[in-house]
Each structure stands twice: as structure tokens, then as C-alpha cells.
Amino acid sequence: MRLREMTEDDLPQVLELQRELAFQDWNEKQFLSEIRASYADCIVCEDEGRECGRGKTRCKLLGYAIFHLLGPNSELLSIATRESEQRKGIGSQLLHAGLDKLTDPDDQCFLEVRNSNVKARAFYEKHGFKLYSIRKKYYADGEDAALYRFSRRSPR
């Protein structure tokens, strides 16, 4: 496995990953916008099989993460790992790749997640994110959002 910057060539696999996980929050145009934004950090984790790289077929995308790095207040916009690859540390690697770019002790990273997504909430809490608020009826279907904050000052 290796982490690298997301490129436009990754979009078919990124969109496929969203379909696999049954969430299609973003479309191709939105991903393109993030890849091109100077303040966005778009990371992918890919399988380094024998048949990928150096002009051969593309490596299988295992997961991705998108952060907005906005000085002291960054945001995790999206993170996903193929279902078959979950619980293997890929999500943790992707998350840490973004959080490691927070270098000042006062830097923070924010995120929102569906209140009912217990699995994701446990993942974020395991990595040092603290729940700081609930945003009522945030999503189009009326579900609440759980708002989390990661601070460099608090231990991971």
C-alpha cells in the first residue's frame, strides 16, 4: 500500500468506491474541484500490486481522504475505504496523513458525520476527535449531524 496525491485519473475508482459504500455524496465535478483547489489535500491509498505503475494498469484504489487545509482550522470533508479493506489500518493512514499536516499546537481539524453512523463516530473518537455539538436536522432526510473537533493540543 502507498499513499499519494489524488489525480483526475483516480476519479473513476473514487466514484466506484462511493457506489460500493452506498453513499454518493459527491459527483465527479465536485471531486475535480477539490483536486484543483490549492487549499485541498486529496489523498489516495492504492494497492501496490506487481501489475501496477510504470505504464501498466492503474493500481487498485483502496481508499481516499479529502481535507481542506485552512490554516489553524482545517476540515475533513470525506474519507472512505473499500469495504473489503476496512479494519486494516487504511483509514487510519489516510486520516493521519491529513492530520500530520497540522503542525501548530493550536491547529484544529473539524468534521461532521451522520449521528447514526456509529462505526464512523467510533473511528474518529479512536483517533482523538471529540464531539462538540449536534446539528439538528442537518441532512436532507432530516437526520442530525454530529460535529467533531481534533486538536493538536489533545493527545491522539
Roles of regions detected by a PLM:
Residues 1-3:
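Extreme N-terminal starter segment of soluble prokaryotic enzymes
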Residues 5-84, 88, 92-102, 151-155:
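Acetyl-CoA-dependent GNAT
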Residues 71-73, 108, 145:
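A generic structural signal for beta-strand entry/edge sites
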Residues 91, 95, 116-120, 137-142:
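Short glycine/proline-centered loop/turn elements that form peptide/ligand docking sites
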Residues 102-112:
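Conserved GNAT acetyl-CoA-binding A-motif
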